[in-house]
Amino acid sequence: MRTPLLSLENLSIYLNGFKGDTKKLVSNININIHRGEFVALIGESGSGKSLSALSTVGLLPSAIKASGTGKWLNLNYDLAEHNSLKMFRGKEIGFIFQEPLVSLNPLHTIGKQIGECITTHAHIPNADLKHKVIALLKDVKLDDPERRFNHYPHQLSGGQRQRVMIAMALSNKPKLLIADEPTTALDVTIQKEILDLLHSLRASYDLSILFITHNLKIVKNLADRLYIMKEGEIIESGKTEDVFKKPSHAYTKDLIEPKIKIIKSRLNSPKILLSAENLSVKYKGPRSLFRSSSKDFCALNKVFLNIKLGETLGVVGESGSGKTSLALSILKLIDYQGDIKLHLPEPRLRKKERLKNYRRNVQIVFQDPFSSLSPRLSIRDIIGEGVISHRIFSKEQVEEKILLALSRVDLDKDTLERYPHEFSGGQRQRIAIARAIIMEPKLLILDEPTSSLDAAVQKQI
């Protein structure tokens, strides 16, 4: 019998509460990964899959503790001892995090950040270091790597940033690559490119891969074996082909073929709530000392739009097609040309107050809940910020509204004193939805709200 590259035995993970209580998040799971194998760990938001992966390299938050035994080839180690895991981190095990924009330092170029990953584990001259970084960028198929070397994270698209994260994870030629939801919030075209890239790198770098995802279907043709997690437990495992052909658990069946009930709008009003005419958005091209002007980019070109009261309108398009620009212009968060009108009675207000009243009636849930939620605010402050700013409710009424909004998105009141980084991606999106609906808007704009959610939670949303 082959010796696994990595084994996790009886892994349990606990959250230490504010009042000294302990909550079990992951319960006695066992995972084996062999050399050259592609293993997928699948589960819905909050199932414990990302925490399980973080525990392998000692990256759990301070309030969360792990117990159990890890085994790297023939070396046993205690999963509770964070210091014993440092020897694997970045060298033997590379890690791709879920949100590249958050993981990358906005103040340093990508060349410098990848270089730091290399020099942490090896001494290498600067000239050789640059060549090695550029070679890594070529390996991950980042276009024009010599130029991208000096770019900052904000100058790259979501897919490009994810390629940079992959390059960082591969920088010390690890034996195991852990990819935590690497295609979350990317459109289907870019998703396929990233998955194809990981497939090719698996062969060229002789990698084992632990791929964490909520989307069972995207690993159907990639993974050798699957582990299905639910509520902190592994409920099913096996070869990918066997699980897809004959799933034994009802939850797995629902992941493979989620049954989404289509609910028709109960409101069938002919009244137009919002109209947009000749709506155009242009972004200025880059300027420099040597070029006084450059071609502007047209994101929207003379768009006409009517949204009726009670109507659900879908806007479909791939990355870069202008969907988000349309949403931001309707919210009046960016400059636009054309006319946008909300057909509601307008109180007599000053211009600044009119805009505030407009945005009370038009709310948005952004695509990436991690970057749209302030890391410095508690969940109570995040959800209540909007209603507090309007100063039309008492302190007691605000508290009632916060609790009601929280219950509507199926989160309990214990979450109110916690912070965004303590939640899974799906839970953060629920918080973002609660922040929007607490305002009781007439129009709710959802910018790809389910792209980062698993099939079961997508169905719930």
Language model features: what each stretch is:
Residues D128-R147, Q397-D414:
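Conserved ABC ATPase "signature" region
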Residues H151-L156, Q160, Y419-F423, Q427:
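Conserved ABC ATPase signature
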Residues T69-M87, P125, D196, D339-N357, ...:
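ABC ATPase NBD Q-loop/coupling interface
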